[in-house]
Curated annotation (Swiss-Prot):
Binds 1 Mg(2+) ion per subunit. Binds 1 thiamine pyrophosphate per subunit. It comes from Bacillus licheniformis (strain ATCC 14580 / DSM 13 / JCM 2505 / CCUG 7422 / NBRC 12200 / NCIMB 9375 / NCTC 10341 / NRRL NRS-1264 / Gibson 46). Mg(2+) binds at residues 493, 520. Residues 442-522 are annotated as: Thiamine pyrophosphate binding. GO terms for cellular component: acetolactate synthase complex. Keywords: Hydrolase, Magnesium, Metal-binding, NAD, Thiamine pyrophosphate. It is an enzyme of class 3 (hydrolase). HAMAP family: IolD. One of its GO terms (molecular function) is 3D-(3,5/4)-trihydroxycyclohexane-1,2-dione hydrolase activity. Gene3D superfamilies: 3.40.50.970, TPP-binding domain (3.40.50.1220). Pathway: Polyol metabolism; myo-inositol degradation into acetyl-CoA; acetyl-CoA from myo-inositol: step 3/7. The keyword Nucleotide-binding does not apply. The keyword Nuclease does not apply. This is 3D-(3,5/4)-trihydroxycyclohexane-1,2-dione hydrolase.
């Protein structure tokens, strides 16, 4: 069967990756941009040898933590709208285990990444090898089995010829908009170096065509009838709308029929914040404008959204007794949610075709959209001017910390900077085409409510898995996607401590990133959650054994890595640092000490969490009763 070429399994892998292309809207580009790797005994003499011999066009980066470099790869793919990827190669055992959190993050967000962890010996001759786990009930179990639940596709290669069918399946999954997610191919470390006579045809240029799925006539007719029969429809813009590139169609439909837009975290910056009908974030971390509009809507048009609990306020955000749902999604599974009328098709194409079927229609929102937006902009302006006072200060998160405790934080951290004031000063100062990234803590809520992105695809939030540590690592991925733009990681001290290894990688390869570190000396978001539900402040503040607030010099840590660092505890210092950071060629870190409880609170929203049904604390008993009361009005499924 044709000409053969003798290669090791690892050499065949690298040769194949170099020949993968993607074709979207008439544009054909290489799909695999490069590979992140940390070499260990499981991959250094296999994949390492193959890369050293001939990496082709693949860019190779040495990561510092397997989870971190996989986050960077995911962020790159997400920012490139899933049209390019990086592969990730790790050694066996702990290196592979470190991929689990990153794989879960990519899976929850439907982002394609190729994970290539090494595996134990296929021959089992030297078993148990270094970093191999042993189970009494099966010799076939390895650490890599932990990646099965968090991979869209998973395979183990124990013979060289298995690689061919496995790679074809993996790339089919990664290039399918409906199924996109992490593909994991585990390669036994002895098999990496084993040679085989591969068919040369396997290494020919392979183009993966991503054609836009068209809606059927039935779907279009049903969707148009639903919209025309509604009085107050609302468009919920999800990540699928961004990946589809549906900005123009969303604006056209919203303007023509006076339909307000609200956004999920993944959908934010699909349409600019200053578009008149864009009411901002929806749900638990949403704006008052969006949540008010949602309560009055009689039709929710979900465009590429998964309807997470944060978007639906745990299924209390809408008038479920009367409102109907129209879901436009390439994923049939997602389209089925909330008893919706389903259009399983591409968002951009569907909206374009729907636009022509709604002639003469106008919603009854009238001037309400403008009124809601103006009301919210006034609140946003107020939050930009919050000033701390040492007496009678009421923070946004009320009734948690006394004035004495807030003053203690101000004294120890030597700051009076409120978080919302700092965030909005940053939004005002950075260049409009800069890209910001965040993932966990209180900052995603502040960002979804307050951040104005007026250039499309400049807001990058990982809020499907909300994985602490994604922020700094992901910023490296942003820089690889946008080498000529400033990229900013907005990160709390909790997430920074969890993982920031790829800051060193960014410095090492001269890929400038900017880390904006908000330090309130604790896990502030979860501290709010525990206290909101009747508990005390328990092990969420960063305090010493003798109850003293920790004051860590994060700027000195980053300086030791080689970053240009700044300390900014006033708005004047912050703006000056931001302007100076723009002039730098090296990665920067701006450390801001911010006061706890000065992040935004929720607006007309509710989050269902597991409150203790039995407690000696009256406050917890009260919180449980309140939760049960809210569930009476929540949709059950």
């Amino acid at each position: 069967m044709g000409k053969k070429i003798r290669l090791t399994t690892a050499q065949a892998l690298i040769k194949f990756l170099n020949q993968q292309y993607i074709h979207v809207d008439g544009e054909e580009t290489p799909f695999v941009e490069g590979i992140f790797t940390i070499f260990g005994h499981g991959n250094v003499v296999g994949i390492g040898q193959a890369l050293e011999q001939d990496a082709g066009h693949l860019k190779v980066f040495q990561g510092k933590n397997e989870q971190g470099m996989a986050h960077a790869a995911m962020a790159y793919s997400k920012q490139m709208l899933r049209r390019k990827i990086y592969a990730v190669s790790t050694s066996v055992g702990p290196g592979a285990a470190n991929l689990v959190a990153a794989a879960g993050t990519a899976l929850a967000n439907n982002i394609p990444v190729l994970l290539i962890p090494a595996d134990t010996f296929a021959t089992r001759q030297p078993d148990p090898v270094l970093q191999q786990v042993e189970q009494e009930y099966s010799a076939a179990i390895t650490t890599n089995d932990a990646l099965k639940p968090v991979s869209r596709y998973w395979d183990r290669i124990t013979r060289p010829e298995q690689l061919m069918s496995s790679l074809i399946r993996a790339f089919e999954v990664m290039t399918d908009p409906a199924k996109a997610g992490p593909a994991t191919i585990c390669i036994s470390q002895d098999v990496e170096g084993e040679a085989y006579d591969f068919d040369e045809s396997f290494f020919e240029k392979r183009v993966h065509y991503v054609d836009r799925k068209e809606p059927s006539e039935r779907e279009l007719k049903g969707a148009a009838e639903l919209i025309k029969s509604s009085k107050k429809p609302l468009i919920l813009v999800g990540g699928g709308a961004k990946y589809s590139g549906a900005r123009d169609e969303l604006i056209a439909m919203s303007e023509a029929y006076n339909i307000p837009l609200v956004e999920t975290q993944a959908g934010k910056s699909t349409v600019e914040a200053d578009f008149a009908n864009n009411l901002g974030g929806m749900g638990i971390t949403g704006t008052l404008a969006a949540n008010k509009a949602a309560r009055g809507a009689d039709l929710i048009i979900g465009i590429g959204t998964r309807y997470t609990d944060f978007a639906t306020s745990s299924k209390t955000a809408f008038d479920f007794d009367n409102a109907k749902f129209l879901n436009i999604n390439v994923s049939r599974m997602q389209a089925y949610k909330l008893d919706a009328f389903q259009v399983v098709a591409d968002a951009k194409v569907t909206l374009g075709k729907l636009h022509g079927l709604l002639e003469g229609y106008k919603s009854e929102f009238g001037s309400t959209i403008k009124e809601l937006k103006d009301e919210w902009l006034a609140e946003r302006d107020r939050l930009s001017k919050v000033t701390f006072k040492r007496e009678n200060f009421t923070p946004e998160i009320k009734d948690h910390f006394s004035q004495d405790i807030l003053n203690e934080y101000a004294d120890v951290l030597q700051t009076e900077l409120p978080q919302t004031t700092a965030l909005l000063a940053i939004n005002e100062t950075v260049d409009p085409d800069s890209v910001v990234i965040c993932s966990a803590g209180s900052l995603p809520g502040d960002l979804q409510r307050l951040w104005h992105s007026n250039v499309p695809n400049t807001y990058h939030l990982e809020y499907g898995y909300s994985c602490m540590g994604y922020e700094v690592s992901g910023t490296l991925g942003l820089k690889l996607a946008h080498p000529d733009r400033e990229v900013y990681s907005l990160v709390g001290d909790g997430s920074f401590l969890m993982l920031h290894s790829e800051l060193i990688t960014a410095i090492q390869y001269n890929k400038k990133i900017n880390v904006l570190l908000f330090d309130n000396s604790g896990f502030g978001c979860i501290n709010n959650l525990q206290m909101d539900h009747g508990n005390g402040s328990y092990y969420c503040e960063f305090r010493t054994a003798d109850n003293q607030i920790l004051n860590v010099d994060y700027a000195k840590v980053a300086e030791g890595y080689g970053a240009k660092t700044y300390k900014a505890n006033t708005i004047e210092e912050l703006k000056a640092a931001l302007e100076d950071a723009k002039k730098q060629d090296v990665s920067t870190l701006i450390e801001m000490k911010v006061l706890p409880k000065t992040m935004t609170d929720g607006y007309d929203s509710w989050w269902h969490v597991g409150v203790a049904e039995v407690s000696e604390q009256e406050s917890v008993q009260k919180a449980y009763k309140a939760k049960e009361k809210m569930l009476e009005s929540a949709k059950q499924y």
